């Protein structure tokens, strides 16, 4: 079983890397040379695959029932059309090719994503529990409402609360994401390189990365020091979209 999980993750890794490489290659040749990054940008940090893998691994312990990683991804994608956390990035140009910036993870978006992830997890858990009870010859009603009532009676809490309390975390913590993405300071651009100077209590932290500007899209590589547990997520670029202001 563990070998099957490993092979599945490897397949997803290769597909993700191939798609990301093709996207970046295309944009590299067709991107504009606009160095003015001024404006409010936002990106959706997709954690659907990580949440699905974590839930999938935990659900393997339910005896005599089967669930695939694809099944878990379907559950996760049925909520909010996938699980994403909004990251906001603002640039204000103060001189030619330089200015100030601010980046932060939306706490409200994180809370909504976390809730949706566990609701999807609970839906899968209840379906598998109903299947297990049916196989064991449980004669009473095994629809979702009845199983939810059974879980509440057994554990003294709802399925979502039970999974939040006793199952593994489906998302990186908000603190970890804030440590990775939040910050402000000054920036400068040169050719295809964006350099940001993050101001912190320890001093100034320098971060240099290639960027691609294509109309209202700004593509940045995901941080190689990603807080995500699944290795393939580090290959996905972050695609920020410029928020249009009404004139």
Where are these predicted regions, by residue range?
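Lipid interaction determinants
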Residues: 10-247
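Positively charged n-region of N-terminal signal peptides that target proteins for export
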Residues: 1-7
């Amino acid at each position: 079983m563990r070998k099957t999980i490993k092979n599945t993750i490897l397949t997803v890794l290769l597909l993700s890397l191939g798609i990301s490489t093709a996207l970046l290659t295309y944009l590299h040749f067709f991107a504009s040379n606009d160095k003015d990054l001024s404006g409010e940008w936002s990106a959706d940090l997709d954690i659907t695959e990580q949440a699905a893998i974590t839930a999938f691994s935990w659900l393997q312990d339910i005896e005599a029932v089967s669930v695939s990683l694809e099944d878990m991804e379907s559950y996760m994608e049925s909520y909010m059309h996938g699980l994403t956390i909004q990251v906001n990035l603002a640039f204000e140009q103060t001189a030619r090719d330089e200015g100030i910036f601010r980046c932060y993870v939306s706490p409200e978006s994180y809370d909504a994503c976390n809730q949706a992830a566990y609701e999807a997890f609970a839906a899968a858990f209840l379906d598998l529990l109903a299947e297990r009870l049916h196989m064991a010859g449980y004669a009473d009603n095994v629809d979702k409402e009845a199983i939810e009532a059974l879980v509440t009676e057994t554990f003294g809490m709802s399925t979502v609360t039970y999974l939040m309390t006793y199952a593994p975390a489906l998302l990186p913590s908000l603190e970890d994401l804030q440590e990775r993405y939040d910050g402000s300071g000054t920036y400068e651009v040169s050719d295809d390189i964006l350099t940001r100077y993050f101001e912190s209590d320890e001093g100034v932290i320098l971060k240099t990365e290639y960027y691609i500007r294509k109309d209202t899209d700004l593509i940045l590589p995901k941080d190689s020091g990603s807080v995500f547990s699944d290795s393939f997520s580090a290959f996905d670029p972050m695609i920020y979209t410029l928020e249009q202001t009404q004139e």
